[in-house]
Amino acid sequence: KETEQEHNDQTKAVRWALNNLKGIETIHILGATGGRADHTIGNTSLLMEYTRMFDLKDITIEMVSDDGTIFPINDTIEFECGPGRSISIFTPDNSLRIRSEGLMYPTDDVVFDNWWKATLNKTVQDNVRLELSHRSIALIMLD
């Protein structure tokens, strides 16, 4: 039983999984939206923090909800998702530039000075590539 109160239950569960499930490749977080907007924003933003807090090399962490899948990135990534999917990209780093391939609306010139800037996009290829200008944190949301 965790007694510390510096972190929320989601973070405690992720930390427990990383410490106790050796060889783990993927962590799926379910039920993290809680039916409340503030709960959803808080828990999804924590996904980005996990890339800083924990050594996630070779470990995929994603939040699954009725609305889709959300996962953090901290470097250039290419992933398979198929064409026609809704995709949104969020980052708190307004100095970050993300060059994209496989999206209907390229993100190359997006200035991430507000969360809505790269939302409501569509995938147009089997694979999406997001090239970050520097290591940072961002969230990807797929329907």
Regions found by a protein language model. Name each.
Residues 38, 49-82:
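Class I SAM-dependent methyltransferase SAM-binding "motif I" and its flanking Rossmann-like core
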Residues 23-26, 58, 84, 127:
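A general structural motif
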Residues 27, 61, 137:
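Hydrophobic anchor at the start of a short beta-strand
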Residues 1-2, 54, 59-61, 84-88, ...:
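A glycine-rich helix N-cap at a beta->alpha junction
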Residues 1-52:
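Acidic/Gly/His-enriched mid-domain segments of enzyme catalytic cores or analogous surface patches
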Residues 66, 73-143:
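Long, charged alpha-helical interface segments
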Residues 31-34, 63-68, 91-93:
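Generic secondary-structure microfeatures
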Residues 42, 52-54, 114, 130:
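Short alpha-helical interface elements
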